[in-house]
């Protein structure tokens, strides 16, 4: 080691994940708290926690659980469900945490009207309407709206509209009904201008294109 040089050793000791002392969901009325706790990843300590490790707090898990709770409610008709606040407090010994999630369930909604609007290109509107799985009289479900969006964009993509978009937008009415409008933008149809094969040393490009 040359004069003036020093060796510096840095030891990094990662802190242990805090265990969950108590997890509470405030504002749940339509569903029992036990039912909501069953669908999320974070758990109270149990006999199986020592190998599942599901009673350890992690910010990423909490964020995912908040999304899970919201999706659960919005698939059960609660279109205006909202998570009002989330509080995480740690015990004095920094070994455990208390988690409190405050929610506003809102009201349940029933689908009253479904419309398809936007730029459809040369696609017949009825062909796209047949792909809509959200129907009048159904309990509002965000999952069905998302699935319809995927069906519409997939169908348009298969028809050459590679950059097509579809967005289902609910309008909530005071009478407990929801109007759903699917806004579609087919965009421009994409065409294949040329197919080039690489690596073939025997068959000519023209023959391969003709056979494909």
Regions found by a protein language model. Name each.
Residues 1-212:
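Interaction-mediating elements
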């Amino acid at each position: 080691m040359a004069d003036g040089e020093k060796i510096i050793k840095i030891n990094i000791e990662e802190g242990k994940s805090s265990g969950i002392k108590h997890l509470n969901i405030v504002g749940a009325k339509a569903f029992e708290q036990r039912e909501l706790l069953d669908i999320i990843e974070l758990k109270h300590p149990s006999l199986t926690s020592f190998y599942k490790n599901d009673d350890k707090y992690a910010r990423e898990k909490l964020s995912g659980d908040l999304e899970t709770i919201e999706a659960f409610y919005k698939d059960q008709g609660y279109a205006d469900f909202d998570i009002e606040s989330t509080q995480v407090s740690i015990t004095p010994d920094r070994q455990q945490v208390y988690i409190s999630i405050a929610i506003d369930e809102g009201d349940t909604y029933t689908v009253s009207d479904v419309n398809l609007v936007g730029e459809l290109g040369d696609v017949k509107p009825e062909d796209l309407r047949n792909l809509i799985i959200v129907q009048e009289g159904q309990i509002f479900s965000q999952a069905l709206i998302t699935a319809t969006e995927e069906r519409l964009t997939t169908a348009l993509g298969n028809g050459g509209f590679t950059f097509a978009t579809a967005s289902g937008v609910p309008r909530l009415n005071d009478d407990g009904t929801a109007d759903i409008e699917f806004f579609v933008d087919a965009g421009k149809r994409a065409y294949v201008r040329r197919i080039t094969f690489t690596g073939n040393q025997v068959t000519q490009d023209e023959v391969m294109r003709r056979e494909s």
